[in-house]
Amino acid sequence: MNSETNSLSTRRHALLLATVQEFIATAEPVGSQQVAAHYSLGVRSAMVRSMMAELEESGFLTQPHVSAGRIPTDKAFRYYVDHLLVSSRIAFEDRAQIELHYSGRSRGLDDVMRDTPKLLALLTGQAALVMAPRLEAMTIERVSFVRLRERQVLGMFVATADRVENRLVETDRDFKQDELDRIAGYLNESLAGRTLDEARRWIERELKEQRAAYDQFRRDALALGGGAIGEKGDRTEVYIEGRVKALDQPEFTDPERVRELLRALDDKSALLALLERSIQQNGLMVSIGSENYDPRLACLSVIAASYATGSESVGSLAVVGPVRMDYDRVIPLVGYTARTLTRLLEH
């Protein structure tokens, strides 16, 4: 919180929070009589009107026209969210729904990733995104090879949460299966417990230092290991649900604006960049309206949280909706879901 937003008097603080809450509930400009009637501020309507004018001068509120009530700005929502983050707790019903969704199910990682945005979209009524674990950050558990035909081998590795990756490796010579098994054993001793990125660097370092120059077995092992792991690249999946739900709001009545927002929510590279920000922050991130890097999302808010394996953040999830979002409910819900995914990956 900056000093300006942190220095509101007690009454103005209470009034601003009440105005934001009323706007979230109604999607209509908020009048002084409306706030005075619905919230116990301890002042009369005339005083409320005067304080709202001061909040407008400070950039927290705006007035569509003279006779209308006032609408909170992005600055007001930022103030509201910064104060919420101190005390928000997940609703009991939301926590129970999340626990029920994930409990007692034996599912693969891909199924969990596909189902999670469906759950978030259902609970929040907004768009929900999940970035699957970044392969580069996942830990290798074991490597294996299967001879397919002459000079062709299937390289496989199992990573965190039983994620399995296969690569077809063309070889310079033919291998028998027992040779491949010995090579897999050697690589497992060296690579198990390393992330994919660390394993790739280890292979590159071994080749560079030419330790395998006069050792055919090690030379073959490094070649096959490198082939199984593959080159570094963008293999991250993003799953999204509820695009239409997020835009089925009073704010979004202009068809062209809706089309632009739908295009933004279909842009994988933009979504990845958005989700990467929460990984870099290593925790919860709330980006409100004009704070979003993508100008197409300037009328939306993003609530995102990263999930981890061990101490490494490997993916993230987010709820995207109008700036007039129910932050009090959605922020703890997103955070709890991310922590639940972390627990699932660890077990």
Regions found by a protein language model. Give the residues of each.
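Short alpha-helical segments that sit at the start of domains
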Residues: 1-17
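A short glycine/serine-rich beta->alpha loop
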Residues: 2-4, 61-66, 324
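Helix-turn-helix-type domain boundary/helix-start signal
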Residues: 5-6, 41, 70, 173
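Alpha-helical hairpin
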Residues: 7-8, 43, 72, 90
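Residue-level marker of regulatory loop/turn positions in helix-turn-helix DNA-binding domains and
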Residues: 8, 28, 250
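N-terminal helix-turn-helix
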Residues: 18-21, 25, 29-85
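Intrinsically disordered, acidic Ser/Thr/Pro-rich low-complexity regulatory segments
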Residues: 82-318, 322-347
